[in-house]
Amino acid sequence: MIRTLIVDDDPFVRMSLQTILEAQDDVEVCALGADGDEAVELFERERPDVLLMDIQMPGSDGLGAAERILGAHKHARIVFLTTFSDDEYIVRALRLGAKGYLIKQEVATIAPALRTVMAGQSVLGGEVLD
């Protein structure tokens, strides 16, 4: 099972992602969070295989949380799922050590992306590669 932590400020997105991922035989959502501070706290407590997280959230954002998590756990697998395909965000996320960067509109790619990251590879959503 791929234990996955989902962090997004939108409760509808969190619940939708949970529903989509838990329909997979090999994915378990271990916790849900709403901001970067919760991402750090839940990562420490749950030790997920993959953290699926939005970049822009009120308060503590995803990039700041990723920096804190990767500072303490350099092998953490973080995949950003966002509406932003901005070069600045992509470059910053990858420099921090994120294993993936997906666009929210590409929902069908999420579960395969988690499997790819678990296999030791990195993933980038289609829009990001344009």
What is each of the regions a protein language model found here?
Residues 1-13, 17-21:
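Conserved acidic segment of CheY-like receiver
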Residues 8, 54, 82:
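Active-site residues of response regulator receiver
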Residues 26-34, 42:
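Short hydrophobic/Thr-rich beta-strand motif most characteristic of the beta2 strand and flanking loop
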Residues 35-38, 61-64:
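Acidic catalytic/metal-coordinating carboxylates
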Residues 46-52:
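Active-site beta3 strand of CheY-like receiver
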Residues 57:
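Receiver (REC) domain active-site loop signature in two-component systems and cognate sites
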Residues 88-95, 105-130:
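Short, flexible helix-to-coil linker/hinge segments that flank and couple to helix-turn-helix
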